[in-house]
Amino acid sequence: MKPTQFAMAGLLAMGVGLAAVPAAAQQRITVNIGSSHPTTNIWVHAMKEVFQPEVDRILKAGGGKYEVRWRENYGGTLYKFTDTRAAVRDGIVDVGMVGTVWENSAMPLQNVTYFTPFATTDHELLIQIFDKLNTTVPALRDSWAAQNMVPLSSLITDSYDIYANFPVRTLADLQNKKINAPGTSANWLRDTGATPVDGALTTYYTNIQTGVTQGALSFASGIGPARVYEVAKHLTRVDIGSMYFGSVATNKKFFDGLPKDVQDAFVQAGKATSKAHGEHVSKVAKAAMDTMKAAGLQVADLPAAEKAKWVNSLPNIVQPWLQATGENGKAVLKAYFDELRARGVKPLRDWDAQNR
């Protein structure tokens, strides 16, 4: 064989050998993702529309070594809203929407906003704050870990106001009125003369229609789809504020077992989900307000003097929460209000200052 033929044969042999070596196999990881609410819900929408595709995009951009196989369990197919914490904690799903608002006994620290009304109406800012607090405040971070969870993206409501079948021009207009204000929000009516009545977005319409109540404390992105404005024609803006609702979270044991690249993809996708969630709530709230106004909703602002009277007449409603949560609660309260002020927010009441 001539040298050139020998060299060519060698190269061909090498080529055959190289061809016989398979490329690095892509690792497929199954992720069970779910929620108690449908994907049309403001707290779930970005999970499906942003978190999942963003994880896929990041992994593909990183070389495609890993691929996620999503098993979707949205809309309460596996569990109801009362079980969002247990579902993620126990691994019924690997990633899920956790409504800490329903977990005041197991996760009280996360409910600080519900005990400190009139702090901020900027729900997009609130997302940024809690994305930070959940990972930097030891008490909050540890409380998630104690539940075998890692928070990835913060969930919020837009600002609460009064939707009623009567106008509210002064605080005196609330005297002897029954207002739907479930759970902790009942505290916001303390010493106003109104009587809080338990309920939910799914019951407000019937409650008001049948005279059980005359109105509800709620937010536009919820009231609009529930069509409560059909029986409550008056919206009084009082700026009770936006509330931290919970987080999209992942089961900690599951997360800790993921390859580092996939963990990083989850964290980065969580940040994108937070941004998209805030923008989506803004869009839904505006669309709801436009629809409600077109249907005849009368909108008015509570005069500043009357609002101040409401804010300052409230008893120290955060004190029982602080007594129950101790030093951890104080740390969370301080961190929350420090973040508000650092971002230019001036709370209408300094709940932290009066509870140092």
Language-model features: locations:
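Bacterial N-terminal signal peptides that target proteins for export
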Residues: 1-10
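Signature of the catalytic double-stranded beta-helix
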Residues: 127-139
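Sec/Tat signal peptide C-region and signal peptidase I cleavage site
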Residues: 18-25
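Intrinsically disordered, low-complexity regions enriched in polar/acidic and amide residues
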Residues: 4, 25-26
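N-terminal secretory/targeting leader peptides
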Residues: 26-125, 140-356
